[in-house]
């Protein structure tokens, strides 16, 4: 194959994330470049038994399926690309009725080492967003008054912060992306802080620590590798699930905290340290709300109830905002149902802006 067939076209195209392409393509075709990693490569055949390739490519924001037909100039080149390869894909992206979002008149090349590093760390904008979210978590942990809950939270961030930063909030549905768990937890901490100012009887320190630890088991169940967007299946996560792992992690870090000299100075602090640990374990165990949804026990304290609904609220709103951006529109104001939401979505009412009243 000639190098010209593999070279990106000379036209000037902007670089986008897959989510940006998907959102813009809702209304018109989009010419642009995406940098992504090949998640899977499947060899398939048409009804006429002609071979074609089906590449699933992924970046920090989402995934896209690229079908490489036998007569495409890049068919042979794509056939040599392994799963895990990092590529630049340039073309016109359109939202079709048969295959959904797909590129037309496209070309492809491998990323160089610098581009590959940026792909996994994200653009400066996405890095700043992630750094702000993690800084919010650190600030909130530092403000926890109960020394036991603050210290066990600090131990978690110290030991598992790097893994935390690349974990997803879920394998699908909500915050299902590299770094999604940090964004989920940071947003939940803001909500929990606001809620405790309204319901003053809530134990603020316990609720904040519960938010931090509620999905800590997903550092194993939903962890991405250091370089990659393909989430592997973890044996421990599959065998026991993130709730059990999270509870075990709390116990492990609490045991580590007990060995520190400062722990002895807390022996007369009320409430007793063991009772604090039990309540934190309850929040982790009960945060799914009902046994049918995976919790071994249902919420039995105000903080456990609050955590369950804060978690559910953030997940549902994340799903909805994503659907408003990229969901299939049945009309200008109605978006097709996205599970697990109960039905079609309706475009939200715009916020009233003073001074924009009709002059008629």
Predicted regions and their residues:
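Short, acidic/hydrophobic/Gly-rich beta-strand patch recurrent on exposed beta strands
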Residues: 54-59, 224
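OB-fold nucleic-acid-binding modules
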Residues: 2-38
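N-terminal intrinsically disordered, cationic/polar leader segments
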Residues: 308, 325-326, 330-360
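Divalent metal-dependent catalytic cores for phosphoryl transfer on phosphate-bearing substrates
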Residues: 173, 197-329
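OB-fold single-stranded nucleic acid-binding module
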Residues: 40-52, 63-120
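Extended, charge-rich, solvent-exposed interface segments
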Residues: 98-168, 245
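Active-site flanking loop/helix segments enriched in acidic
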Residues: 163-184, 227-234
């Amino acid at each position: 194959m000639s190098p010209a067939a593999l070279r990106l076209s000379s036209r000037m195209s902007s670089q986008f994330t897959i989510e940006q392409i998907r959102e813009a393509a809702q209304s018109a075709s989009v010419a642009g470049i995406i940098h992504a990693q090949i998640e899977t490569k499947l060899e398939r055949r048409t009804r006429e038994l002609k071979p074609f390739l089906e590449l699933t490519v992924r970046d920090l924001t989402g995934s896209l399926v690229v079908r490489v037909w036998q007569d495409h100039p890049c068919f042979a080149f794509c056939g040599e690309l392994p799963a895990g390869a990092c590529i630049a894909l340039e073309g016109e992206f359109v939202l079709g009725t048969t295959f959904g979002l797909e590129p037309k008149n496209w070309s492809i090349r491998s990323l160089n080492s610098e581009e590959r590093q940026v792909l996994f760390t994200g653009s400066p904008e996405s890095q700043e967003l992630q750094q702000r979210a993690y800084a919010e978590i650190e600030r909130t942990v530092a403000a926890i008054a109960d020394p036991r809950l603050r210290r066990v939270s600090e131990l978690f961030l110290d030991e598992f912060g790097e893994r935390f930063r690349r974990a997803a909030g879920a394998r699908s549905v909500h915050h299902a992306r590299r770094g999604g768990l940090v964004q989920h937890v940071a947003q939940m901490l803001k909500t929990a802080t606001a809620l405790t100012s309204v319901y003053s009887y809530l134990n603020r320190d316990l609720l904040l620590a519960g938010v931090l630890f509620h999905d800590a088991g997903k550092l194993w169940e939903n962890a991405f590798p250091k370089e990659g967007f393909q989430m592997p299946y973890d044996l421990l996560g599959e065998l026991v699930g993130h709730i059990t792992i999270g509870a075990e992690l709390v116990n492990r870090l609490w045991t580590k905290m007990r060995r520190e000299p400062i722990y002895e100075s807390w022996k007369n602090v009320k409430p007793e340290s063991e009772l604090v640990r039990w309540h934190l374990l309850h929040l982790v165990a009960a945060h799914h709300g009902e046994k049918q949804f995976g919790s071994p026990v249902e919420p039995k304290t105000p903080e456990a109830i609050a955590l369950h609904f804060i978690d559910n609220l953030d997940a549902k709103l994340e799903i909805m905002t994503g659907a408003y951006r990229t969901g299939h529109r049945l009309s200008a104001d109605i978006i097709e149902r996205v599970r697990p939401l109960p039905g079609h979505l309706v475009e939200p009412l715009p916020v009233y802006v003073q001074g924009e009243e009709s002059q008629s």
